[in-house]
């Protein structure tokens, strides 16, 4: 095994290039069940006809669980949006269209989003009254069966050297309401401080699907609470401001 270079470093994983393979090496002690779940989600996405890196094996390297997949050559949309600022609107439109395309795919065996949200709200450490209010909001919103990526961010979409998209990181994939996934992506833009990008993205999604912005906004307090289950202190303050949005929001 020859690890050419580190591609990315996260709190719980390091991603390496190894020739024509990509190795996602999880930290020691990382849940085996979570690793296998992520790999299974990605395999199901592939079987649904979604462009994803093909998984080649699940391995243990130096005692650490590792997902081995094809290495995809290209640049992320996040990088392209920075390098080619004059084309940011074009890339944002492509990004929105890719997500809309995901919503048309069927992956019935994925985790139910509503069930996952209930669990995440319980893990936030928020007071009981606020949690109950979030549960009530969640129950009042429609339950759908759309494929939701759960972490759909420009950094998780590669535009290959051939000009085709490839979607990464399927750890949080579920089936549920598409507008919840859109609310998640909107907040990801906002967490990075890209308010114009967030607004442009949401406007494009609403225009292309005929979805009212107000409907997407109803999901934002719930999505923000779910992200609070695993976030740093800086993010927590920002997310809490969304969780505490008025009930009529």
Predicted features and spans:
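ATP-binding glycine-rich loop module of kinase domains
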Residues: 4-36, 43
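Structural motif at the C-terminus of the N-lobe alphaC helix and the adjacent alphaC-beta4 loop
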Residues: 40-51, 102
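Short beta-strand micro-motifs within the conserved protein kinase catalytic domain, predominantly
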Residues: 54-65
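Conserved short submotifs of the Hanks-type protein kinase catalytic core
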Residues: 63-76
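Internal "kinase-insert"/substrate-recognition segments embedded within catalytic cores
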Residues: 85-113
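An alpha-helical support segment within catalytic cores of ATP-dependent transferases
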Residues: 104-150, 158-161, 166, 241, ...
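Activation of the activation-loop gatekeeper triad in protein kinase-fold domains
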Residues: 169-173
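Helix-rich C-terminal or lid/interface subdomains of diverse kinases
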Residues: 184-249
